[in-house]
Swiss-Prot record:
It catalyses: hydrogen sulfide + glycine + NAD(+) = ADP-5-ethyl-4-methylthiazole-2-carboxylate + nicotinamide + 3 H2O + H(+). The gene is thi4. GO terms for molecular function: iron ion binding; pentosyltransferase activity. Fe cation binds at D161, H176. This is Thiamine thiazole synthase. Pathway: Cofactor biosynthesis; thiamine diphosphate biosynthesis.
Length: 262
Protein backbone atom coordinates (compact mmCIF):
# COMPACT_ATOMS: atom_id res chain seq x y z
CA UNK A 1 0.00 0.00 0.00
CA UNK A 2 1.83 3.05 -1.32
CA UNK A 3 -1.04 5.56 -1.15
CA UNK A 4 -0.34 8.91 0.46
CA UNK A 5 -1.61 9.25 4.03
CA UNK A 6 -3.59 12.35 4.96
CA UNK A 7 -2.28 14.01 8.12
CA UNK A 8 -3.65 17.52 8.40
CA UNK A 9 -3.16 18.91 11.91
CA UNK A 10 -6.30 21.02 11.94
CA UNK A 11 -8.46 18.15 10.71
CA UNK A 12 -7.03 15.83 13.36
CA UNK A 13 -7.72 18.30 16.17
CA UNK A 14 -11.23 19.10 14.90
CA UNK A 15 -12.03 15.40 14.66
CA UNK A 16 -10.91 14.74 18.23
CA UNK A 17 -12.76 17.73 19.67
CA UNK A 18 -16.02 17.08 17.84
CA UNK A 19 -16.15 13.36 18.62
CA UNK A 20 -15.25 14.01 22.27
CA UNK A 21 -17.89 16.72 22.66
CA UNK A 22 -20.54 14.51 21.07
CA UNK A 23 -19.56 11.65 23.38
CA UNK A 24 -19.80 13.77 26.53
CA UNK A 25 -23.17 15.20 25.53
CA UNK A 26 -24.43 11.63 25.28
CA UNK A 27 -22.94 10.54 28.62
CA UNK A 28 -23.93 13.31 31.04
CA UNK A 29 -27.20 11.52 31.86
CA UNK A 30 -27.14 7.71 31.95
CA UNK A 31 -28.81 4.77 33.64
CA UNK A 32 -25.79 3.44 35.53
CA UNK A 33 -22.34 4.79 36.38
CA UNK A 34 -19.81 2.15 37.41
CA UNK A 35 -16.82 3.50 39.29
CA UNK A 36 -13.79 1.25 38.81
CA UNK A 37 -13.06 -0.90 35.76
CA UNK A 38 -11.76 -3.94 37.60
CA UNK A 39 -13.10 -7.49 37.28
CA UNK A 40 -16.42 -6.93 39.04
CA UNK A 41 -17.03 -3.56 37.40
CA UNK A 42 -16.38 -4.84 33.89
CA UNK A 43 -18.61 -7.84 34.51
CA UNK A 44 -21.45 -5.66 35.76
CA UNK A 45 -20.99 -3.38 32.75
CA UNK A 46 -21.23 -6.27 30.31
CA UNK A 47 -24.45 -7.67 31.73
CA UNK A 48 -26.08 -4.27 32.13
CA UNK A 49 -25.18 -3.06 28.66
CA UNK A 50 -26.22 -6.25 26.89
CA UNK A 51 -29.66 -5.76 28.44
CA UNK A 52 -29.97 -2.29 26.97
CA UNK A 53 -28.98 -0.31 30.06
CA UNK A 54 -27.05 2.88 29.27
CA UNK A 55 -23.84 2.25 31.18
CA UNK A 56 -20.62 4.21 31.62
CA UNK A 57 -17.57 2.90 33.46
CA UNK A 58 -15.13 5.40 34.99
CA UNK A 59 -11.53 4.36 35.69
CA UNK A 60 -8.86 6.62 37.17
CA UNK A 61 -5.99 4.80 35.46
CA UNK A 62 -5.36 4.70 31.72
CA UNK A 63 -6.13 0.99 31.49
CA UNK A 64 -9.00 -1.17 32.66
CA UNK A 65 -8.81 -4.51 34.48
CA UNK A 66 -7.82 -3.44 37.98
CA UNK A 67 -5.35 -5.77 39.63
CA UNK A 68 -5.97 -8.65 37.24
CA UNK A 69 -3.02 -7.81 34.98
CA UNK A 70 -0.46 -8.65 37.67
CA UNK A 71 -1.81 -12.13 38.36
CA UNK A 72 -0.43 -13.51 41.58
CA UNK A 73 2.71 -11.62 42.69
CA UNK A 74 3.49 -10.86 39.07
CA UNK A 75 3.05 -14.43 37.83
CA UNK A 76 0.82 -14.07 34.76
CA UNK A 77 -2.07 -16.30 35.79
CA UNK A 78 -5.18 -16.04 37.92
CA UNK A 79 -7.46 -18.71 39.33
CA UNK A 80 -11.22 -18.88 38.85
CA UNK A 81 -13.59 -21.50 40.23
CA UNK A 82 -16.92 -22.94 39.16
CA UNK A 83 -19.50 -21.61 38.40
CA UNK A 84 -17.76 -18.29 37.67
CA UNK A 85 -15.83 -19.92 34.82
CA UNK A 86 -18.93 -19.60 32.65
CA UNK A 87 -18.72 -15.80 32.81
CA UNK A 88 -15.20 -15.90 31.36
CA UNK A 89 -16.13 -18.49 28.75
CA UNK A 90 -18.91 -16.19 27.52
CA UNK A 91 -16.21 -13.59 26.84
CA UNK A 92 -14.15 -16.11 24.84
CA UNK A 93 -11.46 -16.48 27.49
CA UNK A 94 -9.40 -19.68 27.46
CA UNK A 95 -9.37 -21.60 30.75
CA UNK A 96 -7.04 -24.42 31.75
CA UNK A 97 -8.10 -27.13 34.16
CA UNK A 98 -6.05 -27.57 37.32
CA UNK A 99 -4.95 -31.19 37.74
CA UNK A 100 -6.28 -32.59 40.99
CA UNK A 101 -8.59 -29.60 41.53
CA UNK A 102 -11.70 -30.24 39.41
CA UNK A 103 -13.43 -27.04 40.56
CA UNK A 104 -10.52 -24.74 39.65
CA UNK A 105 -9.22 -23.25 36.42
CA UNK A 106 -6.33 -20.96 35.56
CA UNK A 107 -6.47 -18.14 33.03
CA UNK A 108 -3.96 -15.76 31.50
CA UNK A 109 -3.91 -12.55 33.55
CA UNK A 110 -3.54 -10.41 30.42
CA UNK A 111 -6.13 -12.19 28.30
CA UNK A 112 -8.82 -11.98 31.00
CA UNK A 113 -9.08 -8.18 31.42
CA UNK A 114 -8.46 -7.58 27.71
CA UNK A 115 -11.31 -9.82 26.56
CA UNK A 116 -13.65 -8.93 29.41
CA UNK A 117 -13.18 -5.24 28.67
CA UNK A 118 -13.85 -5.82 24.97
CA UNK A 119 -16.94 -7.86 25.87
CA UNK A 120 -18.28 -4.95 27.92
CA UNK A 121 -17.55 -2.49 25.11
CA UNK A 122 -19.10 -4.75 22.48
CA UNK A 123 -22.20 -5.07 24.67
CA UNK A 124 -22.56 -1.29 24.54
CA UNK A 125 -20.87 -0.03 27.71
CA UNK A 126 -18.64 3.04 27.50
CA UNK A 127 -15.35 2.89 29.41
CA UNK A 128 -13.64 6.20 30.20
CA UNK A 129 -10.11 6.14 31.59
CA UNK A 130 -8.19 8.88 33.37
CA UNK A 131 -11.34 9.97 35.22
CA UNK A 132 -11.67 10.09 39.00
CA UNK A 133 -14.89 10.35 41.01
CA UNK A 134 -14.28 12.93 43.72
CA UNK A 135 -17.83 13.24 45.05
CA UNK A 136 -21.42 12.13 44.55
CA UNK A 137 -24.61 13.90 43.58
CA UNK A 138 -26.85 13.49 46.63
CA UNK A 139 -30.45 14.64 46.27
CA UNK A 140 -33.26 13.92 48.73
CA UNK A 141 -31.25 11.19 50.45
CA UNK A 142 -30.49 9.33 47.21
CA UNK A 143 -27.31 9.05 45.18
CA UNK A 144 -28.20 10.49 41.78
CA UNK A 145 -24.86 10.59 39.99
CA UNK A 146 -21.16 11.33 40.33
CA UNK A 147 -18.87 14.35 40.45
CA UNK A 148 -15.88 13.77 38.21
CA UNK A 149 -12.45 15.23 37.59
CA UNK A 150 -9.51 14.47 35.34
CA UNK A 151 -7.08 12.23 37.22
CA UNK A 152 -4.15 14.26 35.88
CA UNK A 153 -5.68 17.47 37.28
CA UNK A 154 -6.17 15.79 40.65
CA UNK A 155 -2.59 14.48 40.67
CA UNK A 156 -1.26 17.93 39.81
CA UNK A 157 -3.13 19.42 42.76
CA UNK A 158 -4.76 22.09 40.62
CA UNK A 159 -7.83 23.88 41.97
CA UNK A 160 -10.21 23.30 39.06
CA UNK A 161 -13.92 22.66 39.52
CA UNK A 162 -15.28 19.27 38.42
CA UNK A 163 -18.28 18.34 36.25
CA UNK A 164 -21.00 15.76 36.80
CA UNK A 165 -22.71 12.72 35.33
CA UNK A 166 -26.29 12.03 36.40
CA UNK A 167 -27.38 8.42 36.83
CA UNK A 168 -30.26 6.38 38.17
CA UNK A 169 -27.77 4.13 39.97
CA UNK A 170 -24.07 4.19 40.85
CA UNK A 171 -21.91 1.13 41.48
CA UNK A 172 -18.83 1.26 43.69
CA UNK A 173 -16.47 -1.31 42.21
CA UNK A 174 -13.30 0.52 43.27
CA UNK A 175 -11.79 -2.52 44.97
CA UNK A 176 -10.08 -2.62 48.34
CA UNK A 177 -10.38 1.14 48.89
CA UNK A 178 -14.18 1.26 48.45
CA UNK A 179 -13.57 4.90 47.59
CA UNK A 180 -17.12 5.82 46.57
CA UNK A 181 -18.90 4.66 49.72
CA UNK A 182 -16.01 6.05 51.77
CA UNK A 183 -16.50 9.43 50.11
CA UNK A 184 -20.21 9.35 50.87
CA UNK A 185 -19.49 8.51 54.51
CA UNK A 186 -16.74 11.12 54.90
CA UNK A 187 -18.61 14.02 53.37
CA UNK A 188 -22.00 13.26 54.92
CA UNK A 189 -21.33 12.25 58.49
CA UNK A 190 -24.96 12.83 59.42
CA UNK A 191 -25.85 9.70 57.43
CA UNK A 192 -24.05 7.54 59.99
CA UNK A 193 -22.33 5.36 57.37
CA UNK A 194 -19.29 3.39 58.51
CA UNK A 195 -16.87 1.49 56.29
CA UNK A 196 -14.79 -0.87 58.46
CA UNK A 197 -12.58 -2.12 55.61
CA UNK A 198 -11.67 -5.64 54.64
CA UNK A 199 -10.21 -8.25 56.95
CA UNK A 200 -7.04 -10.29 56.39
CA UNK A 201 -6.91 -13.17 53.93
CA UNK A 202 -9.22 -16.17 54.19
CA UNK A 203 -9.87 -17.15 50.59
CA UNK A 204 -12.82 -19.47 51.14
CA UNK A 205 -14.66 -17.07 53.43
CA UNK A 206 -13.82 -14.08 51.27
CA UNK A 207 -15.01 -15.69 48.05
CA UNK A 208 -18.26 -16.97 49.51
CA UNK A 209 -19.16 -13.66 51.12
CA UNK A 210 -18.73 -11.53 47.99
CA UNK A 211 -22.09 -12.20 46.37
CA UNK A 212 -23.86 -12.01 49.72
CA UNK A 213 -22.26 -8.62 50.37
CA UNK A 214 -23.15 -7.31 46.91
CA UNK A 215 -26.17 -5.08 47.40
CA UNK A 216 -27.59 -1.58 47.55
CA UNK A 217 -25.98 -0.01 50.62
CA UNK A 218 -27.59 3.41 50.27
CA UNK A 219 -30.43 4.53 47.99
CA UNK A 220 -28.96 4.64 44.50
CA UNK A 221 -25.56 3.23 45.49
CA UNK A 222 -24.47 -0.39 45.10
CA UNK A 223 -21.22 -2.08 46.10
CA UNK A 224 -19.66 -5.06 44.34
CA UNK A 225 -16.32 -6.86 44.24
CA UNK A 226 -13.79 -6.06 46.94
CA UNK A 227 -15.62 -2.82 47.71
CA UNK A 228 -18.51 -4.99 48.95
CA UNK A 229 -16.24 -6.93 51.28
CA UNK A 230 -14.58 -3.73 52.48
CA UNK A 231 -17.97 -2.24 53.33
CA UNK A 232 -19.07 -5.39 55.19
CA UNK A 233 -15.69 -6.19 56.83
CA UNK A 234 -15.29 -9.32 54.72
CA UNK A 235 -12.08 -11.24 54.15
CA UNK A 236 -9.74 -10.78 51.19
CA UNK A 237 -8.95 -13.75 48.98
CA UNK A 238 -5.88 -13.13 46.83
CA UNK A 239 -5.50 -14.12 43.18
CA UNK A 240 -8.69 -16.17 42.93
CA UNK A 241 -11.28 -14.12 41.07
CA UNK A 242 -14.46 -16.18 40.76
CA UNK A 243 -16.27 -14.27 43.47
CA UNK A 244 -15.43 -10.99 41.77
CA UNK A 245 -17.09 -12.00 38.51
CA UNK A 246 -20.13 -13.46 40.27
CA UNK A 247 -20.41 -10.30 42.35
CA UNK A 248 -20.41 -8.10 39.25
CA UNK A 249 -23.05 -10.25 37.60
CA UNK A 250 -25.25 -10.19 40.70
CA UNK A 251 -24.95 -6.42 40.95
CA UNK A 252 -26.11 -6.08 37.36
CA UNK A 253 -29.04 -8.41 38.02
CA UNK A 254 -30.11 -6.42 41.09
CA UNK A 255 -30.13 -3.18 39.12
CA UNK A 256 -31.90 -4.76 36.15
CA UNK A 257 -34.64 -5.90 38.52
CA UNK A 258 -34.95 -2.38 39.92
CA UNK A 259 -35.14 -0.84 36.45
CA UNK A 260 -37.77 -3.35 35.33
CA UNK A 261 -39.95 -2.56 38.34
CA UNK A 262 -39.83 1.22 37.80
Amino acid sequence: MDGKLRADEVAVTKSILKSTFDMWMDLIDVDVVIVGAGPSGLTAAKYLAQNGVKTVVLERHLSFGGGTWGGGMGFPNIVVEKPADEILREAGIKLDEVIGEPELFTADSVEVPAKLGVAAIDAGAKILTGIVVEDLILKEDKVSGVVIQSYSIEKAGLHIDPITISAKYVIDSTGHDASVINTLARKNKDLGIEVPGEKSMWADKGENSLTRNTREVFPGLYVCGMAANAYHAGYRMGAIFGGMYLSGKKCAELILEKLENK
